[in-house]
Amino acid sequence: MRIISRPTSEGEAPEHWALDAGAADIATLDIPPSAHRSRIFAIDIRFMVRATAAGAWQALSVELNGVREWSRRIDTHGQTDTLDYHCRRELDIGQALRVRALTQLGDARRLRLFIEAEEQAGP
């Protein structure tokens, strides 16, 4: 598991947080709070699998700060397939964010689970 982060001070480049969980079934990315400003993050989660038999399927559930945000189960098409989720989340001053991705599969093999959060310009 590898965490990539680029935190910033006010006036510098936007924050970029990423977690490459490899073939893990669960990934958690923690974004610490800022004591000085509110922030908006674009969050992307990608789950990639390889089918090992006919009838393969994959599922991804996303939690933000412990609350289920989204969940989907789909049939795996082709030799490899991905299941992606994208959302935006606004964080007030002092608010942290925990992004958790949980996966399941049938007749498939996990290849990669990746979470990325990129700070966006304000409203």
Describe each region flagged by the PLM.
Residues S38-I43, R88-R112, Q120:
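Noncatalytic modules at the cell exterior or secretory-pathway interfaces
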Residues R46-M48, E63, W70:
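Short, charge-rich amphipathic interface segments used for partner binding and complex assembly
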Residues A53-R68:
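Short, surface-exposed beta-strand/strand-loop-strand elements in extracellular ectodomains
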Residues H36-R39, A51-A56, D107:
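A short beta-turn/strand-edge loop motif at beta-sheet boundaries
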Residues P32, D44-R50:
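Short edge beta-strand/loop segments characteristic of extracellular beta-sandwich folds
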Residues A13-L19, R68-G78:
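Solvent-exposed serine/threonine-rich low-complexity stretches and specific carbohydrate-binding patches
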Residues A27-P33, D81-R89:
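Exposed aromatic-hydrophobic patches
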Residues M1-I26, D30-A35, L105-P123:
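C-terminal interaction-tip segments
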